[in-house]
């Protein structure tokens, strides 16, 4: 099982380095009727409460409640907000100044990394969740994977980002 305290510590390091932390998440469970948008918002609020115990927090959450095939009612639709679309990134960009050259998308699915690349930010696939298997499959193919870097954990991804930032500052 993944240690969420390590996750909070990694996020805190990024916050301490001046990064804004933005979550963009597909929530097809809303479209499928498994849970409500209020449930998603409550979960995000709870996540921040847990993270704040370790000095970290998420600056903003953006979610897509739609699904093009399995949705119910207003939630069954094609949209640009669902990753790999860039709609949630564009919403975040309206709320926060984004320096794309110094921004990163971290995710455990190729939809995440593809969305980041489409938006013009570097993408990191992490090995937690689905990432390790996807990375293994990508290595077996003789083509460039749809991500810029692979890290086994969020801690490794954060360290890579911080090292890259340090290198840029010292040039």
Segments the model singles out, each with a brief description of its role:
Residues 1-14, 59-60, 64-72, 154:
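Short secondary-structure boundary segments
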Residues 20-26, 59-64, 126:
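Short beta-strand segments at enzyme active-site cores
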Residues 37-41, 45-60, 68-105, 109-171:
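Asp-based, Mg2+/Mn2+-dependent phosphohydrolase catalytic module
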Residues 1-24, 31-46, 78-87:
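Short, acidic loop-to-helix structural element flanking the phosphoryl-transfer center
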Residues 25-32, 64-70:
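Short, charge-patterned binding micro-sites
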Residues 23, 27, 31, 105, ...:
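Short glycine/serine/threonine-biased micro-segments
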């Amino acid at each position: 099982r993944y240690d969420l305290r390590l996750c909070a510590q990694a996020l805190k390091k990024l916050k301490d380095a001046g990064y804004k932390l933005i979550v963009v998440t597909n929530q097809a469970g809303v479209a499928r009727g498994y849970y409500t948008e209020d449930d998603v918002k409550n979960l995000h609020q709870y996540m921040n409460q847990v993270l704040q115990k370790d000095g970290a927090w998420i600056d903003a959450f953006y979610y897509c409640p739609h699904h093009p095939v399995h949705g119910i009612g207003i939630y069954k639709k094609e949209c640009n907000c669902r990753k790999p679309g860039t709609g949630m990134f564009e919403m975040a960009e309206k709320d926060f100044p984004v320096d794309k050259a110094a921004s990163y998308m971290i995710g455990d699915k190729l939809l995440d990394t593809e969305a980041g690349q489409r938006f013009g930010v570097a993408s990191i696939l992490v090995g937690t969740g689905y990432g390790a298997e996807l990375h293994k499959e990508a290595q077996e193919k003789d083509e460039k994977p749809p991500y810029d870097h692979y890290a086994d954990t969020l801690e490794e991804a954060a360290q890579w980002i911080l090292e890259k930032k340090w290198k840029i500052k010292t040039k």
